[in-house]
Amino acid sequence: MGFRGAWNKRNRLIEDLDTFLKLYKKAQKAYKKVRKVEFSNNDELIENAKKRYQEIWDEFRAFVNKKAWVDPKLWATIRKMNQTGDRKVVKTYSRDSQVISDFVNHTIAVHNGKTFVPIYITPEMVGHKLGEFAPTRTFRSHPEKSAKVVKKK
């Protein structure tokens, strides 16, 4: 799919954040229940839990499919800050979340594997992923050639 596909999704956002959060939490609960039930020896319980989880997951995927992904907790936090007018730094591990118009003029600290890199969101960043602005590797310059290097013949 690559970058072009992700760029095409930038205008297709999830309309209802509350429903999105509800389905997300419901799917997480169902998954935890499946993991918990797997330790029991009752095959019927395991099958019912897996079936229930699959139904919830299918509903969640249908709701989210072909839309820009934004971490629901991050989005809810930013939405609260927009309503109250706060401008605190928000820490997130979600590098795969797409920058949406609600994030503009906020500072989001994205984890690069070692530290949180603060990123001030501008309108030009909308449509890109948060991870693009927090590099995970540090570039150390190429080694200088020393006088000891001998040419091979």
Curated annotation (Swiss-Prot):
The entry's cellular-component GO terms read: cytoplasm; small ribosomal subunit
**Cross-referenced InterPro entries, in alphabetical order?**
Ribosomal_uS19, Ribosomal_uS19_bac-type, Ribosomal_uS19_CS, Ribosomal_uS19_SF
- Region entry Unknown, spans: 1-63
Q: Using the UniProt annotation, give all residue ranges assigned to the region (Small ribosomal subunit protein uS19).
A: 64-153
**What Gene3D superfamilies has UniProt attached to this entry?**
30s Ribosomal Protein S19, Chain A
Report any one BP term from Gene Ontology.
translation
Coiled-coil intervals:
none
RNA-binding as a keyword?
yes
- What keywords is this UniProt entry annotated with? Ribonucleoprotein, Ribosomal protein, RNA-binding, rRNA-binding
What GO annotations for molecular function exist for this entry? rRNA binding; structural constituent of ribosome
Q: Which SUPFAM superfamilies is this protein grouped with?
A: Ribosomal protein S19
Instruction: Give the top-rank taxon of the lineage listed in the UniProt record for this protein.
Output: Bacteria
Q: Give the protein's function.
A: Protein S19 forms a complex with S13 that binds strongly to the 16S ribosomal RNA.
**Family assignment?**
Belongs to the universal ribosomal protein uS19 family.
Record-given protein name: Small ribosomal subunit protein uS19
Gene name per UniProt: rpsS
